């Protein structure tokens, strides 16, 4: 079984009778194994990265190199967007997300400027988002810090930590001894 919650991944499906594509998050590993009549597996490979096409397509909202909707959802049909997070989470919760998932020392300042900006007008695009937060970073650190901010938002939007924990718990149950 191969899991990917992004429908765009279906374009890369291998035509092989031993391969089954599951358009879902790997957090549901145990459910789909049961559905396919599989009780145990010899190995599990989890790709925790983001595909380059996510960064290349500005309409997906994963990159600060272009403008488009502030989205960041791996599954375009589910969940909240990055704009939802930025516009609706409390300032404190935003700060926690930037600190925990982006390891940003100035997480409180980032959250504060976002809260002030969204009180005037909702932040819905990458361009609007960058206009608010870019002044917080020096030119020499800008790209590195923006990457951390975007990483933190992406992790929150897609509930990546929760999904990973669930998948690892399921993996411990279905992995054969010695697997």
Predicted regions and their residues:
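S-adenosyl-L-methionine-dependent methyltransferase catalytic core, i.e., the SAM/SAH-binding region
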Residues: 1-179
């Amino acid at each position: 079984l191969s899991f990917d919650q992004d429908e765009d991944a279906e374009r890369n499906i291998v035509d092989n009778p031993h391969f089954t594509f599951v358009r879902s998050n790997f957090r549901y590993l145990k459910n789909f194994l049961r559905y396919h009549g599989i009780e145990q597996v010899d190995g599990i490979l989890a790709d925790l990265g983001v595909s380059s096409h996510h960064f290349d397509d500005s309409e997906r909202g994963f990159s600060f190199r272009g403008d488009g909707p502030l989205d960041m959802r791996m599954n375009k049909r589910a969940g909240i967007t990055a704009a939802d997070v930025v516009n609706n989470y409390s300032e404190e919760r935003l700060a926690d997300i930037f600190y925990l998932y982006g390891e940003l020392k100035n997480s409180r300042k980032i959250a504060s400027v976002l809260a002030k900006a969204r009180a005037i007008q909702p932040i819905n695009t990458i361009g609007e988002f960058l206009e608010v937060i870019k002044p917080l970073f020096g030119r020499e650190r800008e790209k590195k810090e923006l990457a951390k901010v975007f990483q933190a938002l992406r992790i929150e939007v897609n509930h990546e930590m929760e999904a990973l924990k669930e998948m690892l718990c399921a993996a411990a149950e279905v992995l054969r001894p010695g697997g």
